[in-house]
Amino acid sequence: MSDTHLEIERTYDLPEGGALPDLVGVGGILRTEHQDPFELDATYWDTDRYDLVAARVTVRRRTGGPDAGWHIKRSESDTVRHEQHFPLTDDAETVPTEVLAALFTERRGRGLHPVVRITTTRTVTRLLDEDGDQVAELADDLVHAQRLDDDAPETPRTWREVEVETVDGVDAQVAHELFAALDGRFADVGAGPAAVASKLARGLAGAPAPRLQTAEKPDKGTTARVLVKRLRKLRTALLTQEARLRSGDTTDLRQAADTALEIAAIMGGYRPAFAAGDALDRAAEAADGLAEVTARAALAEYLVDRLPRASSPAQDELVDAMTRERILAATRERRDQSVRDVVVFLHGEPFLELLDALDDAVERPAPTAWALRSPKKVAQDVGAEVKPHVRELVRAAVADDTSDTAAEREAADRATTEAAWQATMRARLTMDVLGDDAFPHALWKRIGTAADVLTERVRALHALDALRTTAAIAERGGEGTFGYGVLAGDRVRLAEESYDEAVHALNRV
């Protein structure tokens, strides 16, 4: 079991032997209560590459004080952290399984080992209001940090710092107003906000940390500069979305599908921008796999929202409650299975390889000569690849099918339409990265229109397939199927309309 809370604090640098400022009268603080000093002993862990530090995450095993145990801290800013506590274990040499599981993505699936031992002599002062209720806690820390790597200096680093942490439940804005008021009092005694707010970061100073080694940004005006900037945003979005999906929150499902597809589009459409190698090839395949599995889940989520109801009120009144409930149950089951498939993918080695590739592309870009050209020149090459590929799939999607049975024709129609849809969606996202300033505006617009109408057609075809399956189950159970027919007719109309629009749009690509 673990518990999580929000930690809002500010750290100040104070000279050793210097006096603490008088804080009475600041932000509702009317009296203070000093406590006896106590000792803290913490060992911090990370991967060989220091992936956790790079992700602004710390994990430690700490003894002493009121909250001994294993702690995970995720920094939102220099003052705001999300802290997760796990019970203290007797085995100080092994990270508990539940801690490793909580850090799976940040550690990129790699093992952890001790990197720093930090011992602290802490003296706490409770900061109280007029009623004696605690406003914040001041911790005056004398810190000793010893790196544990092979190149560590023999002498520990020593410094003094003061942490002021607000009590649980205080609004972040109120907390920062308090800190702003405290800054003046600390300045009066020659202290100020710490240049480095993390004990771990200070303790690791000089450590050989591969993930902390970065390269210069590509020059402005180059395609490489645009790609690095875009991939940085996509990586941030992906990590946020995958964390929510792991926790069972599906609210970002469609956004996750869009993010995954754009990453796949960049790694595929701009492949010459990245150095050749098996690792990047595997990462590109992983991006394709993630895009595919999240697209299925997003489509399943769409069916949950839209399939139980017709597009017009008049038609909707013809659908009985039992039909609606069965459809809703079936679509939710399909959605839940699709989400499980996504979570399984997020726990796999290909996803970790994709994250490693994104880390390198963003933190240590090594652009090729092709990528160092202007966006307009690169767009010419990309357009020459994208346009014929889309056209080929378009012809297959709008061609007459000669399959013997209706079921075979429908399956073939769905497959070719999906292929054209995926190609046009990728093409649009590929072009969106550089924009219509680089690509011909007419082509950019036509690809976008084709992607929109194909999205509607794919949704309609999948809706028909789901309705057919659910109606067959209902019929075998002796239930009426009139409502399914109403909804199916509605979807057939949408499919036919979107088909005509798709043919018109795609023939212009």
What residue spans do the PLM features occupy?
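Function-determining surface determinants
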Residues: 1-509
